[in-house]
């Protein structure tokens, strides 16, 4: 079963006493700006979000893994569990469920999570690097450099 394509937002959580990951909620139609209002501000969490958007005239669907870090508002054990389980969760989502995750983001404040932010993150603008100064060649006929001791 592929959860991510049935609903755009999946909310896996860790049961701290049992140290197990389970899917606590899923939502059907959620905009990126609304995810913060669904999440408690004082606990860490994971979100698997399918972001459907238009880019350069084409319809795109990208899966984004969000790891919420509430700062120092949550207990240390909870922060450590969420940080240490992230890699295994992503690996199992990829291997067992076949979910291809385009971006993995760590977010401390949901105010920065907007559609524009996700589009810029998923489709970064290519920056042209200016040509750097190329050093001119030395005079011809001087021979190879010698090491003087």
Regions found by a protein language model. Give the residues of each.
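Long, low-complexity regulatory segments enriched in Ser/Thr/Pro/Gly and acidic residues
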Residues: 1-63, 67-149
